[in-house]
């Protein structure tokens, strides 16, 4: 069984800022989903909330009466969240599946599924916690990623991902557990993270390919992530 680097403290050694640099664009995309689907949640929960920065960014741009509750099993992440918490935003060191009475209008599950040893069991445990679940995952599986020797192994070592998805396998995993897909869209993650000459060179062919066929671009060149709203 893989060692849980989030609990042992190994993860923060590799990612000391706990992905806070991704928080603004993630929060913006969450708001985009809410607007697209005419949702106005009053209580938002997040599984694997990390430092709580996504919730804080959401709070800054949403109804001031909205409440936010985050859960994480990593002590270091919750410690970092202390400066972001306030009267309407709380983060707990806890496994949400073991929290009595946990229920929300919207549950955020952002970059979590790929870390679950048994993600089907995890999906089943999320069903009763909220009528709406918003997922995000990086689409690591692409032809380009597979052809580059050691690419996926390196990502697993850095991010502790246990599973890698395409759009098709991710959506099918949700359907296998009786989730109803309400909305989904790609996000050009590579543009947000473009650094270094090789990554920047790939931006133009990705954009051209994506404009012609988004599914083909994601499968061939990668560099995209996926947001999915489900019931």
Question: Each predicted region: which residue ranges?
Answer:
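Conserved N-terminal segment of class I S-adenosyl-L-methionine
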Residues: 1-103, 110, 120-123, 157-168, ...
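Activation segment
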Residues: 100, 116-117, 174
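A short His-aromatic
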Residues: 111, 115
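Glycine/Thr-rich phosphate-binding loops of Rossmann-like dinucleotide-binding domains
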Residues: 117, 143-144, 192
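A short glycine-rich, Lys/Arg-flanked "PGG" loop and its adjoining helix->strand segment in the class I
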Residues: 120-134
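Short, glycine-/aromatic-enriched active-site segment of Class I SAM-dependent methyltransferases
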Residues: 136-161
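Short secondary-structure transition/capping segments
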Residues: 146-148, 194-197
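A structural motif corresponding to the C-terminal end of an alpha-helix
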Residues: 173, 177-179
């Amino acid at each position: 069984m893989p060692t849980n680097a989030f609990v042992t403290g190994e993860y923060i050694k590799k990612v000391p800022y706990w992905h806070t640099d991704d928080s603004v664009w993630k929060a913006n995309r969450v708001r985009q989903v809410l607007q697209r689907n005419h949702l106005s949640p009053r209580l938002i929960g997040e599984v694997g909330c990390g430092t709580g920065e996504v919730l804080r960014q959401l709070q800054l741009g949403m109804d001031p009466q909205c409440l936010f509750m985050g859960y994480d099993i990593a002590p270091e992440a919750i410690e970092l969240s202390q400066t972001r918490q306030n009267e309407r935003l709380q983060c707990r060191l806890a496994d949400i599946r073991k929290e009595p009475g946990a229920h929300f209008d919207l549950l955020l599950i952002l970059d979590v599924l790929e870390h679950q040893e048994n993600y089907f069991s995890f999906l089943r445990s999320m069903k009763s916690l909220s009528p709406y679940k918003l997922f995000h995952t990086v689409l690591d599986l692409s032809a380009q990623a597979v052809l580059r020797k050691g690419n996926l192994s390196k990502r697993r070592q850095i991010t502790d991902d246990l599973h890698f998805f395409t759009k098709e396998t991710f959506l099918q995993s949700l359907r296998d557990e009786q989730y109803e897909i309400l909305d989904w869209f790609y996000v050009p993650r590579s543009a947000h993270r473009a650094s270094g000459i090789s990554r920047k060179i790939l931006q133009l062919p990705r954009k051209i390919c994506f404009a012609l066929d988004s599914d083909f671009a994601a499968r061939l060149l990668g560099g995209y992530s996926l947001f999915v709203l489900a019931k």
